[in-house]
Amino acid sequence: MTKAYLEASEVERLERVAANLRDRLLVRLLFRLGCRISEALGLKVEDIDLTRSTITIQHLKSRLKLSCIECKQRLGRSHTFCPKCGSKVEKAQAEQQERRRQRVLPVDNDTLGMLKEYIERGGPVSREGKLFIFGINRHRGWQIVHACAEKAGLPKLVNPETGRVHNVSPHRLRDCFAVMAVQRDDSTDGIRMLQEWLGHANIGTTMRYRKVAGQELKDWYERLWPRKEGDNG
């Protein structure tokens, strides 16, 4: 049966069939952090804080647009004065907006232990003077997830918005994390927290995870009219 989202147990199967520690770690981070493939592949050893049990995610989907706090004019990183209203661009203002491109996320002990083992084994790859956790490109990341899905015997998924059927991809692990989070806490505060965790600029993007193949509406209706004992319909 074709469905829209993976279950957490299915993602765990992906991890179990991974070919090596690197591939298992990639699957683990994509799911446990709910990060984008570009963010996972951009991780460096310096982003891992073993003492505080955190990972700093660099938001790579799009560069944050700096803007004037007075007139909202778009600013370049080198601007010291707004080209539209002439207001001075304080360094602290630019740095504050720049920090919004990062998310510092807590990590569970099991995942942290896996990261530590991977680093101690010499897994990270040096590029341009920096140690990247994975050192692979986006295409290879997709290949790893797809190969794990085939090996685990997972079905293809259907896009709930377009109806198109597609293979299991890295982003589907992010989807799984988000759906699981909403199922456990769909309060206003919970959705806001998820928005911040996922790095969504628009909360509308986060809200779509509440619409899981119509199940939410069905559950709501059944709470209004609960089935009586013995009903077969």
Spell out what each predicted region is.
Residues M1-E12, Q58-K61:
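Flexible interdomain linker/hinge and immediately adjacent N-terminus
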Residues T2-Y5, Q73-A92, L224-G233:
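C-terminal secondary-structure termini that scaffold catalytic or DNA-interacting sites
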Residues A8, R16, G42, L50, ...:
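Phosphate-coordinating loops and pocket residues in cytosolic domains that bind phosphorylated ligands
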Residues A8-L33, I37, S126, D185:
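Basic, Lys/Arg- and aromatic-enriched nucleic-acid-binding interface segment
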Residues R16, G123-E128, Q143-E196:
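Short, basic (Lys/Arg/His-rich) helix/loop patches that form interaction surfaces
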Residues L30-R52:
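Short, charged phosphate-coordinating catalytic segments
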Residues R63-R77, F81-G86, Q93-E117, R127-E150:
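C-terminal catalytic core of Y-nucleophile DNA break-rejoin enzymes
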Residues L198-R223:
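Catalytic-site neighborhood detector that most strongly recognizes the C-terminal catalytic loop/helix
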